[in-house]
Amino acid sequence: RKRHPDCDKAADTRI
């Protein structure tokens, strides 16, 4: 996935 670091982080942790 190619997105901003913040968005990528949120998507990766997606609680």
Curated annotation (Swiss-Prot):
Disulfide bond among keywords: yes
Domain of life of the source: Eukaryota
Coiled-coil annotated residue ranges, if any: none
One annotated GO molecular function: toxin activity
Record keywords, A-Z: Disulfide bond, Neurotoxin, Presynaptic neurotoxin, Secreted, Toxin
BPTI/Kunitz inhibitor domain residues: 1-15
Compartments where found: Secreted
Tissue: Expressed by the venom gland.
Signal peptide: none
GO CC terms, sorted: extracellular region
Protein family per UniProt: Belongs to the venom Kunitz-type family.
UniProt subunit comment: Heterodimer; disulfide-linked. The A chains have phospholipase A2 activity and the B chains show homology with the basic protease inhibitors.
Function: Neurotoxin T1-1 is a presynaptic neurotoxin of the venom that exhibits indirect hemolytic activity against human erythrocytes. The B chain is homologous to venom basic protease inhibitors but has no protease inhibitor activity and is non-toxic.
Protein name per Swiss-Prot or TrEMBL: Kunitz-type serine protease inhibitor homolog T1-1 B chain
Organism: Bungarus candidus (Malayan krait)
